[in-house]
């Protein structure tokens, strides 16, 4: 392990420094300058306590202050054996540390810098845990993602900014990876080693506990300084895509090839794809076989394509599916499927500039070419689309105002995206649900939202009707508009709709397919392991300071996420009427259960004490008659009757 100390100065003010600075100027600049020390491990850098403001050093040696402010001063390095020699990886990490510190504001500190696995070497990625001390009562923390083109690079870029709010959760994803969910955003990280992962999770756990205790919620003044870094995002699109990656996607964008680095296989696949269009257009698709298509490609390209048979078949299926073009619902709006979202030629031909992705399992295929807005939901009745329809309406209107067009898609263009287009038509044109459904199904017969989305559309219709008939909501100051999204946990599901009369058989079949796009959801997901529960489990392994105390069942940590039902006997007591939890956090629920258990125990002791007291009086009479003694029994009666005795004394 090596120790690195970085002297940090305030940013340059743009004014020249006097040739002969006075003592007052030196002292002032010395107060602004401070030092931060780091412990350099293999794959991670841990921030140590601040080394102080450096006033004495500034006054004793004014010459270092002649260097331009805003630059990092040379670091003081030490190795484990006290000598100056360092291994190559330590030198690389030292250089990277200096570059990453230069990205920060003077008042912000790096608590941890962890190296992450990169999808495309020789790129390097670092996760920074950054906190600030700018006069805040509570410490605030954000996560930054930093990209290096390679290990020898002398520059780095910023690719991720994730503030840690009170709802931050860390889940272990297996194989050394973990995901951080905060403020509705979820990001995946995978450190390069077990030691790096352990150091990272410890720092993250501490930061999450501080955020939870501080009550940091979006929308207020908390973490306002994070916007400084959000405006500085400057990594290339490939790096941004890697930071935005999700673990449960089913459809992925094709890998981005580095300029001038396409492999021979990629070049051949591009040539096959270019010729495949022409071969399919010139063939009778009702009679031609896959083998004949491959032979025609071999004649055109002049080389055998045996090893590309699976690629050719896959591309043929893709091109066949893309022949089902997106449906033009309005002059500025197309409704389509995953295939339409992946067809770059069709998107450009339709003058699409905005893409509204309503699917949880489908990636953004061309994030560098189009403006995307994502609503990550599954096609299931319990999914909530209503809270997102105000944002989706605004997104579609932005495209129309620019004179371009928007594609709204999900997996098949049947349920999720169709419901969103229906909601847009109802609000934009003042239509009822029935009129909007007739219009959309005429242009795309396979449209059939699942029953849960239809119920939400009915609710949305009532909201729009109330908004049009009364302007009281808009005139009152501070009253939320009736079109504001409803929170999913308080929305009351309407009774199921009766089956619609009529309808084409094709629409019914495709509607069933649309509602079964994700059958794996019905089987239930494996419970995710929460970092907070793991840390509490680890804390229970430490020896207790009170040997006589025992751990009750209610004090055991909840290792798995709150999506699963806890397996303890008093779980039903932590829910309010209607089956909803009173509090999402584990500690209030534990305290509530312990209080209820204590009340039940006191009532049980009191009832048994009265019973024993009655029995003791009866037995005492018998003993006086028979002349026998039962000392142990009398002691037990007196001990258990003490509860009632204390109550009688209180009444007296």
From Swiss-Prot:
Residues 325-466 form the Tyrosine-protein phosphatase domain. Residues 1-16, 80-90 have a biased composition (Polar residues). Residues 266-321 form the DEK-C domain. It catalyses: O-phospho-L-tyrosyl-[protein] + H2O = L-tyrosyl-[protein] + phosphate; O-phospho-L-seryl-[protein] + H2O = L-seryl-[protein] + phosphate; O-phospho-L-threonyl-[protein] + H2O = L-threonyl-[protein] + phosphate. Signal peptide: none annotated. The active site is at residue 410. Residues 540-552 have a biased composition (Low complexity). Keywords: Acetylation, Cytoplasm, Cytoskeleton, Hydrolase, Nucleus, Phosphoprotein, Protein phosphatase. It is found in: Cytoplasm, Cytoskeleton; Nucleus. PANTHER family: PROTEIN PHOSPHATASE SLINGSHOT HOMOLOG 3 (PTHR45864:SF4), SLINGSHOT PROTEIN PHOSPHATASE HOMOLOG (PTHR45864). This is Protein phosphatase Slingshot homolog 3. The lineage of its organism: Eukaryota, Metazoa, Chordata, Craniata, Vertebrata.
């Amino acid at each position: 392990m090596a120790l690195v100390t970085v002297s940090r100065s305030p940013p340059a003010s743009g004014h020249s420094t006097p040739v002969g600075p006075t003592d007052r100027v030196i002292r002032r600049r010395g107060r602004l300058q401070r030092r931060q020390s780091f412990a350099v491990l293999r794959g991670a850098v841990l921030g140590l306590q601040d080394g102080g403001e450096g006033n004495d050093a500034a006054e004793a040696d004014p010459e270092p202050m002649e260097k331009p402010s805003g630059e990092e001063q040379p670091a003081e390095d030490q190795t484990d054996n006290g000598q100056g020699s360092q291994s190559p990886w330590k030198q690389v990490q030292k250089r990277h540390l200096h570059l990453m510190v230069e990205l920060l504001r003077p008042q912000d500190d790096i608590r941890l810098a962890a190296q992450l696995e990169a999808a495309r070497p020789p790129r390097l990625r670092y996760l920074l845990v950054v906190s600030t001390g700018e006069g805040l009562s509570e410490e605030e923390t954000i996560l930054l993602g930093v990209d290096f083109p390679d290990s020898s690079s002398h520059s780095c870029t910023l690719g991720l900014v994730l503030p840690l709010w009170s709802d931050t959760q860390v889940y272990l994803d297996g194989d050394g990876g973990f995901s951080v969910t905060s403020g509705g955003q979820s990001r995946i990280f995978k450190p390069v080693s077990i030691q790096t992962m352990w150091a990272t999770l410890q720092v993250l756990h501490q930061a999450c506990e501080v955020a939870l205790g501080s009550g940091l919620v979006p929308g207020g003044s908390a973490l306002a300084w994070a916007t400084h870094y959000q405006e500085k995002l400057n990594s290339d699109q490939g790096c941004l895509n890697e930071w935005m990656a999700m673990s449960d996607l089913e459809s992925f964008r094709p890998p981005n090839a580095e300029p001038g680095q396409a492999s021979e296989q990629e070049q051949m696949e591009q040539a096959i794809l270019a010729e495949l269009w022409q071969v399919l257009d010139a063939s009778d698709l009702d009679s031609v076989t896959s083998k004949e298509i491959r032979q025609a490609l071999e004649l055109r390209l002049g080389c055998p394509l045996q090893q590309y048979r699976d690629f050719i078949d896959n591309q043929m299926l893709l091109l066949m599916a893309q022949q089902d073009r997106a449906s033009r619902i309005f002059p500025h709006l197309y409704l389509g499927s995953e295939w339409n979202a992946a067809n770059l030629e069709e998107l450009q031909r339709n003058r699409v500039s905005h893409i509204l992705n309503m699917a949880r399992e489908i990636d953004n295929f061309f994030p560098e070419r189009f403006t995307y807005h994502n609503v990550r939901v599954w096609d299931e009745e319990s999914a909530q689309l209503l809270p997102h329809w105000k944002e989706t309406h605004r997104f579609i209107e932005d495209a129309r105002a620019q004179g371009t067009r928007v594609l709204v898609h999900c997996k098949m263009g049947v349920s999720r995206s169709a419901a969103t287009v229906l909601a847009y038509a109802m609000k934009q044109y003042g239509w009822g649900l029935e009129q909007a459904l007739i219009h959309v199904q005429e242009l795309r017969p396979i449209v059939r939202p699942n029953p849960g989305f239809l119920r939400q559309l009915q609710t949305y219709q009532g909201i729009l009707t109330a908004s049009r008939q009364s302007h009281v909501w808009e005139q009152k100051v501070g009253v939320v508009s009736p079109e504001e999204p409803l929170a999913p946990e308080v929305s009351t599901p309407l009774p199921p709709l009766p089956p619609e009369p009529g309808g084409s058989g094709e629409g019914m079949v495709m509607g069933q397919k649309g509602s079964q796009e994700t059958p794996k959801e019905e089987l239930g997901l494996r419970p995710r392991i929460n970092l907070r529960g793991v840390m509490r489990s680890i804390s229970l392994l430490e020896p207790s300071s009170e040997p006589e105390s025992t751990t009750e069942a209610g004090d055991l940590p909840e290792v798995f996420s709150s999506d699963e039902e806890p397996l303890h006997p008093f779980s039903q007591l932590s829910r309010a009427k209607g089956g909803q939890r009173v509090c999402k956090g584990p500690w209030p629920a534990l305290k509530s259960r312990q209080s209820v258990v204590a009340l039940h125990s006191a009532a049980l002791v009191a009832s048994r004490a009265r019973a024993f007291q009655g029995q003791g009086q009866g037995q005492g009479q018998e003993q006086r008659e028979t002349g026998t003694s039962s000392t142990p029994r009398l002691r037990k009666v007196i001990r258990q009757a003490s509860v009632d005795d204390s109550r009688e004394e209180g009444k007296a």
